[in-house]
């Protein structure tokens, strides 16, 4: 296993999976070339990829960061009545949080020619596909937190529709859009667009 190739594959997988889950878009084509059917460029794939490029990837993910022990002030009367469980022995010594944090050494992101890990070309900054909603650098930070804010911005036309469609699919066996991972031009059209919009907003 070539460590850099492994890392690049996992970052690409996170990018593709996030795109399908949150936006209902199949962007994997844009890893090697501009998307053939949807208006997503090769550069836009790697701009989205750059949000995940600074996550530490060690191959073996250790247990999370230990959470600090809470410090609370509780009156004696509280412990005798409503909070009697406070006097019970702790069931866990430590609580771990599974948090993926940014790498300490930030790496630059490059467009990879034909998606190959060993063929970097031009540098790109974190951005999202313009066709969905342009990434406003004054409104969002250029990390995964900023990306999450972008996903849940009320102006984003896809996140809520994709989520509602998946919930509908769980209840009724088929989504309002029958291709839940593809809201792009090759996916199915919603059988009731007004219902999808109404449920999403």
Where are these regions (language model features)?
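Sequence context surrounding c-type heme c attachment/ligation sites in exported
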Residues: 1-78
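Primarily short, surface-exposed interaction patches in extracytoplasmic proteins
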Residues: 8-11, 38-41, 72-201
């Amino acid at each position: 296993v070539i460590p850099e190739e492994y890392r690049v594959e996992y970052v690409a997988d996170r990018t593709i999976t996030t795109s399908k889950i949150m936006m209902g878009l199949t962007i994997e084509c844009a890893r090697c070339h501009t998307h053939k059917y949807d208006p997503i460029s090769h550069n836009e794939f790697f701009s989205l990829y750059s949000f995940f490029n600074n996550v530490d990837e060690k191959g073996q993910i250790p247990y999370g960061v230990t959470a600090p022990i809470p410090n609370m002030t509780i009156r004696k009367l509280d412990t005798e009545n409503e909070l009697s469980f406070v006097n019970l022995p702790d069931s866990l010594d430590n609580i771990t949080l599974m948090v993926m944090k940014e790498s300490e050494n930030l790496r630059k992101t490059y467009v990879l020619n034909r998606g190959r890990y060993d063929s970097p070309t031009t540098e790109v900054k974190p951005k999202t596909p313009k066709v969905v909603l342009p990434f406003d650098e004054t409104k969002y930070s250029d990390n995964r937190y900023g990306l999450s804010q972008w996903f849940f911005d009320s102006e984003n036309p896809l996140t809520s529709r994709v989520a509602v469609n998946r919930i509908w699919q769980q209840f009724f066996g088929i989504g309002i859009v029958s291709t839940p991972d593809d809201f792009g031009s090759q996916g199915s059209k919603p059988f009731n667009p007004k219902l999808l919009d109404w449920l999403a907003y």
